[in-house]
Amino acid sequence: MRPILLQGHERSITQIKYNREGDLLFTVAKDPIVNVWYSVNGERLGTYMGHTGAVWCVDADWDTKHVLTGSADNSCRLWDCETGKQLALLKTNSAVRTCGFDFGGNIIMFSTDKQMGYQCFVSFFDLRDPSQIDNNEPYMKIPCNDSKITSAVWGPLGECIIAGHESGELNQYSAKSGEVLVNVKEHSRQINDIQLSREMTMFVTASKDNTAKLFDSTTLEHQKTFRTEPPRELAALSPNYEHVVVGGGQEAMDVTTTSTRIGKFEARFFHLAFEEEFGRVKGHFGPINSVAFHPDGKSYSSGGEDGYVRIHYFDPQYFEFEFEAREAGSPSG
């Protein structure tokens, strides 16, 4: 499995995301650049210029007309995907950590960090109402007093958002009233990543407590746990198979004194039902900061602390592989 190497950032990758069809791959990093690439061959299609700080999050709407980005320059920006023109600039009091379009692409949400005396907020804007954008007045703003949001996605049908917190809590906020619909605490440390399944019926979380976990999207009921040795800080679900890819590795501050083997910088593949690891992919020099499956399930991409994005197309053996679970008490060897 020889990867396509994308080099378009000078700093560590913070998030990568495919559009719905999977022909485009958006990448953001701890530099002010937002890149878009053709996923089939790794050609850079263009760059969205305007941010002045690290960009933490990116999302594209359902029909890939608009792109949304959130940055440490205390702003969330809306872009025309095709031309790269900035359509809206929403200023905030602190860094924007997460952002996303709802199912219809009409409503955007973003969360801000708890820093410099400002508390964490989740803001909702309706793009069909220009006055909200012009006046920087969201139709709803939810305060998060206890623990800041570190990852968030829209839930099924855009009725709620699912947010992971620094404390390890998972919340479901209503997109209409802002009330907390469900609250669970299955992780003991910060939740760094939340990614939905293709049907949006379940989602996977990855935390600094060395686990990735599978949840029901509606009830937030905990289903499965994938345990690993170093902190696994991100995870993604395959759209075609019962597979989970998880990535991460040793903290970036320790990387210079660590070999890639000891630092556990590879992506690991787990079976969704059996919770067992069945494969690893190496390549990055340093921790993996973001992973995403292509919507067709034939490839996946990873972005690392080394500033590179790698597009991995699976070998034929991957599609022929059948996982056989051992019965309890049967010999292992």
Curated annotation (Swiss-Prot):
Modification sites for Phosphothreonine: T219
Cross-link Glycyl lysine isopeptide (Lys-Gly) (interchain with G-Cter in ubiquitin), where in sequence: K282
Maturation and modification: Phosphorylated by TGF-beta type II receptor.
Locations listed in the record: Cytoplasm
This protein's UniProt keywords: Acetylation, Cytoplasm, Initiation factor, Isopeptide bond, Phosphoprotein, Protein biosynthesis, Repeat, Ubl conjugation, WD repeat
GO molecular function: RNA binding; translation initiation factor activity
Function summary: Component of the eukaryotic translation initiation factor 3 (eIF-3) complex, which is required for several steps in the initiation of protein synthesis. The eIF-3 complex associates with the 40S ribosome and facilitates the recruitment of eIF-1, eIF-1A, eIF-2:GTP:methionyl-tRNAi and eIF-5 to form the 43S pre-initiation complex (43S PIC). The eIF-3 complex stimulates mRNA recruitment to the 43S PIC and scanning of the mRNA for AUG recognition.
Family per record: Belongs to the eIF-3 subunit I family.
Quaternary structure and partners: Component of the eukaryotic translation initiation factor 3 (eIF-3) complex, which is composed of 13 subunits: EIF3A, EIF3B, EIF3C, EIF3D, EIF3E, EIF3F, EIF3G, EIF3H, EIF3I, EIF3J, EIF3K, EIF3L and EIF3M. The eIF-3 complex appears to include 3 stable modules: module A is composed of EIF3A, EIF3B, EIF3G and EIF3I; module B is composed of EIF3F, EIF3H, and EIF3M; and module C is composed of EIF3C, EIF3D, EIF3E, EIF3K and EIF3L. EIF3C of module C binds EIF3B of module A and EIF3H of module B, thereby linking the three modules. EIF3J is a labile subunit that binds to the eIF-3 complex via EIF3B.
HAMAP family referenced in this protein's UniProt entry, alphabetically: eIF3i (MF_03008)
Name used for this protein in its record: Eukaryotic translation initiation factor 3 subunit I
Taxonomic classification: Eukaryota, Metazoa, Chordata, Craniata, Vertebrata
Gene name of this polypeptide: EIF3I
